[in-house]
Amino acid sequence: VPSGRALAHPRKGKIGKVLFPHRGTIWGVMGAVVFLFAHPQALLFWPGVSCILGGELLRLWASGYIKTYRGPMEEVEELVTSGPYAYLRNPLYLANGIIGCGVVLLSGILWALPLFLGSFVLLYGSIIRAEEAFLEEKFGAAYREYAASVPRFVPRLLPYPKRKGTFAPKVLWEKESTTLLTLGLVVLLFYLRGFGVLRVLDRLLGL
């Protein structure tokens, strides 16, 4: 975003505001469909696990700086520019994308990867526009300067100099423990789907 240039007008982020509270449900439904038709392969399974672990580590780093990241946008009280936010503006969404790619690898359905990436861009593109409009309205010039200096997804080499925000470990237990348990269960289910008792689904589904 060029320095001094206004970001999206709040009215242009209406779709994103509608999708924002339902993003977890949307990914859950898509994941369930992929699981049913999955054909896990050992060659792809463990790289998929590695992607999920890497994405979750980034989530843990990022979520520790955002005290209300699971709440509505209106609960945001400060513009956080420390930690991973000093390098890119959307580390949580990047982490979700990495995790999503990992789940596709677990499934063994490589043709689902471009479908996932397309859905990711459509969903988070709308959400990010809504968030940017809200943050610009709330924090004004401070956010415009930050957005002009820090990319959305491609990390900058050096951290943003005007860093603000602290890491709160307690947030990880309060907000991220469910994600950790869910991802562990996802890996287990896909393992059983491909190499254990849940292979019976192939016969039930006629695959």
Which sequence ranges carry the predicted segments?
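Glycine-rich acyl-CoA binding loop
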Residues: G83-A86, N90-L94
